[in-house]
A protein has these predicted regions:
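Helix-breaking motifs and short loop linkers at transmembrane-helix boundaries and internal kinks
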Residues: 49, 81, 103-109, 300-302
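Helix-to-loop junctions at the C-terminal end of transmembrane segments
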Residues: 69-82, 267-279, 363-364
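Structural signature of the two symmetry-related core transmembrane helices
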Residues: 85-99, 281-296, 377
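Paired small-residue
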Residues: 97-100, 108-117, 305-313
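Helix-loop-helix hairpin linking two adjacent transmembrane segments in secondary transporters
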Residues: 107-109, 137-194, 241
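Cytoplasmic helix-loop-helix junction between adjacent transmembrane helices
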Residues: 113-151
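C-terminal transmembrane helical hairpin of 12-TM major facilitator-type secondary transporters
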Residues: 281-325
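A late C-terminal transmembrane helix in Major Facilitator Superfamily
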Residues: 332-368, 376
């Protein structure tokens, strides 16, 4: 009896473009939801009658949901449930959680709904990346995964500014209603254009969980958890920094977020090209350049034009860390590729939680609106130190 063929090896009865585009729409939805709370943090705080640092806990709650949710979903469901079915369930859950946020009217219910919304985040990207790679085949898998992930980056350019604008003009809940609507369209797109992929016979919980013993994988994840946190220490409070310190009109915030997102798109693509040449040097370069960008920004935030330029520079330098670390994880994760893919997003959202928490902490201790930028500088250096330790451990492991 013939063995089942994968979609990439059997006659194609689907559009690769539409399949990956459908997955990217889900990434756009998740990216919009993840960042919109940062753009609307002042509106949320005012409406719920809490302080801006207290509203920052909603950002941390979402990020912690990602950290906690991805590993068990991937390890348990990822080994048993068909990937298309899993993607549909994850996005349905995501849309409902965002609708619950829009309906929440107390700080406690918003906090819980944001945590719940974060649970399927990492699993969606982990499974979506594997689906994109399998559909494209070995010769195009890297570009397919990059295209799927582009939905997240494009969200920072289009989705977040649009959701922020909606929240400012129609109430902050409109931003989350927008995200829930995108989740609904993602469900339709994935159901219609992503083909069914059978569960691999070799997939097992044991194989994935074995990766938890890999020290090189954990150190690489730690680089992202610390080094990427600097972006969120600033991004989480960019709205009050611009309005309270730079003294710009709040209507400028969506424009600043869009330019930050453009920097992220350019930086991510440039870092990907450089990583093909030398992966480890690219990661080092990203961490050093981002540290420099934070220092530059700390001195240039008093003027509207230099402030927006500084935010563009931070986005340009920091975003390259994501794809480069994902590629490094492929090199060090061994047989636990699926778990590593999901844990990468857990690490980045741990960075989200850490950055938002530390940024809020320095603000709550009256250290000034520029203090979150210096937090970013410290976290970038911390990520660099961990990376150098990872290189040393990897070298010692290879000699052993």
């Amino acid at each position: 009896m013939a063995s089942p063929q994968s979609p990439s090896s059997s006659p194609r009865h689907y559009s690769l473009f539409l399949a990956i585009f459908s997955l990217a729409v889900g990434g756009f939805c998740i990216g919009t939801t993840e960042f919109v709370a940062m753009g609307l943090i002042q509106e949320i705080a005012h409406n719920l009658k809490i302080t801006v640092p207290e509203a920052g806990h909603f950002i941390s709650a979402y990020a912690l949901g990602v950290v906690i949710g991805a590993p068990p979903i991937i390890a348990i469901l990822g080994a048993k449930v068909p990937r298309k079915t899993l993607l549909l369930c994850l996005m349905l859950f995501y849309g409902i959680a965002n609708a619950c946020t829009a309906l929440a009217h107390t700080p406690e219910t918003v906090l819980v709904s944001r945590f719940i919304a974060g649970l399927p985040h990492g699993a969606y990207f982990g499974v979506g990346a594997l689906v994109a790679a399998e559909l494209a085949g070995p010769s195009r898998r890297a570009s397919a995964v990059a295209q799927m992930m582009m939905g997240l980056t494009v969200a920072t350019v289009i989705g977040v500014p649009l959701a922020t604008w909606l929240g400012q003009h129609f109430g902050w809940r409109a931003g989350f209603e927008f995200s829930a609507t995108i989740a609904f369209f993602t469900l339709i797109a994935v159901a219609c254009f992503v083909p069914n992929i059978p569960v691999q016979a070799t997939a097992s919980i044991k194989t994935e969980l074995a990766g938890l013993k890999n020290i090189n994988m954990w150190l690489t994840l730690a680089v992202g958890a610390i080094g990427f946190g600097g972006m969120f220490s600033v991004y989480s409070y960019v709205s009050p920094i611009l309005t309270e310190y730079t003294k710009v009109n709040i209507q400028i915030v969506p424009i600043a977020l869009a330019l930050w997102g453009i920097g992220m798109v350019i930086g991510g693509l440039a870092a990907g090209w450089l990583a093909d040449k030398n992966l480890n040097k690219t990661i080092v370069g990203v961490l050093i350049s981002s540290a420099i960008a934070f220092v530059v920004a700390s001195f240039l935030m008093s003027n509207i034009y230099s402030a927006i330029g500084s935010l563009f520079l931070i986005g340009l330098t920091v975003m390259g860390l994501g794809g480069a670390l994902q590629t490094r994880l492929m090199d060090v994760a061994g047989d636990a590729q699926t778990l590593a893919a999901s844990l990468n997003h857990s690490a980045f959202n741990l960075a989200n939680a850490l950055g938002a928490f530390l940024g809020g902490w320095v603000l709550s201790h009256q250290m000034g609106w520029i203090a979150p930028i210096w937090v970013g500088f410290v976290l970038s250096l911390g990520g660099l130190i961990i990376l150098l330790i990872a290189f040393a451990v990897e070298k010692a492991t290879q000699k052993a």
